[in-house]
Design a protein with these regions (language model features):
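Active-site recognition of the HExxH zinc-binding catalytic motif
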Residues: 84, 254-266, 270-273, 277
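Auxiliary, metal-adjacent structural segments of Zn-dependent hydrolase domains
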Residues: 176-245, 249
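Membrane-interface segments at or immediately adjacent to transmembrane helices
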Residues: 134-204
Length: 383
């Protein structure tokens, strides 16, 4: 075999053509072909990453979150929000077809395959940021509302836990008898339409954008997200939120509201939990209020010593104790897959996008609720 002495010569390049062809070495070697359109996607992804870092929060908040993104939200919901088929199925089908075509092009060489693969990643990254991801650059809800976590101490958390406990007792007492049975706790039908108006009203109360009709789907199979310690996820490339079908009915109101808040452009996890709490608290539906109160109580309980929580649980009405038991039993059906890896990766992702607390940001909701109620202690807010 003749050795390759240098990398030479022939370069045909035009962004109006499908491919760029390099001839490497002698004429006996196969030309290296690069997929041109993939270079465009790669460049767009790099540009998105750069401008995300260099432009200030005031820009993203005004021009993207309250401007460009609102237009995207309205257009998407008008065109695709009424589809009975979750967009995740359609997007995954497109990815599978594109992957099959990519494998079928292996005869064009490794340069081509790698350029196509990187182009695919670039397309997903670009769509992520331009369709939603730039919301990570917005001014945080905590800053909008003037919250300061340093102003909340241990005694405040204890008082908030007691308040959340009292609310849970009250909401459970207000349930109709048929909603206190196991079949309701586990299998009552709860869908995104049941929460949308509550979420929009909560956002309006906070003077935040709320146009559009965000969908939150419950795709098959049960447990797919729960096995990754995740109850729900918003996927920007689909324009829709998703919750695990394996969740109990009592867990769904808060989780749907959380993912719907993401769909309206809120990126911070603690802020989405706060909006979910507010939406459920002010709902006219007793099941939504009860489900929201239970989920929020669990967040508050996570901030307390075990003995304090254990002592409280035994004083709850039967429906609350039964709901807590059923949730724990349901969690055991879906054991975590690589929990440490998942936590490390996701926490790193959140911090990379400006969420300083990482996974701990979810529990910021307790501090946010405590400070919100203190600022609005005139009785006009939900207790």
């Amino acid at each position: 075999m003749q050795s390759c002495k240098f990398i030479s010569t022939s370069l045909t390049m035009s962004f109006f053509k499908e491919n760029i062809t390099f001839r490497v070495g002698s004429n006996s070697l196969r030309p290296a072909v690069i997929h041109t359109r993939s270079l465009v996607w790669i460049a767009a992804a790099i540009l998105a990453l750069i401008i995300k870092e260099i432009l200030p929060a005031s820009f993203w908040d005004h021009w993207y979150y309250k401007g460009f993104f609102v237009g995207i939200r309205q257009a998407y919901d008008f065109l695709l929000g009424w589809s009975p088929v979750p967009m995740i199925y359609i997007v995954l089908s497109i990815i599978l077809v594109r992957t099959a075509r990519w494998i079928g092009d292996r005869s064009k060489g490794w340069f081509y395959l790698m350029s196509r693969a990187l182009g695919g990643v670039g397309a997903l990254v670009t769509l992520f940021y331009f369709s939603w991801g730039f919301n990570y650059g917005q001014i945080s809800l905590q800053e909008r509302l003037g919250f300061d976590r340093s102003l909340t101490d241990k005694e405040d958390i204890e008082a908030e836990f007691k308040r959340a406990t009292d609310v849970l007792r009250r909401e459970s007492a207000g349930l109709p008898t048929d909603l206190t049975r196991d079949n309701a706790i586990v299998g009552l039908k709860v869908v995104d339409h049941d929460l949308r108006q509550d979420v929009k009203e909560a956002l309006a109360k906070l003077n935040m954008p709320h146009s559009g009709r965000v969908r939150v789907r419950q795709p098959w199979p049960d447990g797919f997200l729960l096995r990754w310690s995740t109850a729900g996820i918003y996927i920007p490339q689909t324009g829709e939120g998703h919750i695990d079908r394996g969740l109990l009915a009592v867990q769904k109101p808060f989780t749907i509201a959380h993912e719907m808040a993401h769909g309206y452009g809120v990126a911070d996890e603690g802020a989405c939990n706060f909006i979910a709490w507010l939406a459920c608290s002010q709902s006219r539906d007793p099941w939504v209020r009860f489900g929201g109160a239970l989920t929020y109580w669990r967040y508050a309980a996570a901030e307390m010593p075990y003995d304090s929580v254990s002592n409280v649980i035994h004083t709850f009405p039967p429906v609350v104790m039964r709901a807590i038991t059923l949730v724990k039993e349901n969690d055991k059906k879906y054991p975590d897959i690589l929990p440490r890896v998942r936590d490390a990766v996701y926490s790193s992702y959140l911090k990379r996008h400006g969420v300083k607390e990482g996974l701990r940001s979810y529990n910021e909701v307790v501090i946010m609720v405590q400070q919100y109620l203190r600022k609005n202690s005139n009785g006009s807010m939900p207790e």
